[in-house]
Amino acid sequence: MFFHLQQQQDNAFAQTATTVINNNNTAANITLGNPQIIYTEYGKTTNMIPFVVNGTHGSRLSFIGNGTIQGINVTDNGRAISISKADGSIFSRGVGILTANASSRGIAAFSFIGTGHYGTDGKLRDFGPIYFLNATGNLASLKGAAGIYKDQINKAGNAVTKLWLWKQ
């Protein structure tokens, strides 16, 4: 069995080695667009439950926040898992829902991944990608958008989050 897999791998490498990459100018036309800060949120961690799994420390948490995105006042509700890494960094993954506070209510569901560190002032500063999976109503323009967020969370759980958004 191992010999057969090794032979397939060798064949794949042999085929790959003969592939020629044509470097044309089409890549030069790719841009990142003009990302802008479109959202600032003021939030708070509402619940934090520490856990340890196989010696790895982390927390399950929930959060709420308020902000304005594309001129629409929204409330954010979400949850995340944060894991402490051996190098002192923090890895987070979570989901949330922005809900418009307007008469033509809309929602925008998102997921995010982040990494960060605690500063000497005790504040967690982290950043990462955010993906809007679905959106309706007056937030429908966010559907399929991706962005980068950056936030700062103090010891009391108060957070400020900024979002740069890309949409094709």
Please identify what each model-predicted range represents:
Residues 2-168:
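Beta-strand-enriched cores of mature, soluble protein domains
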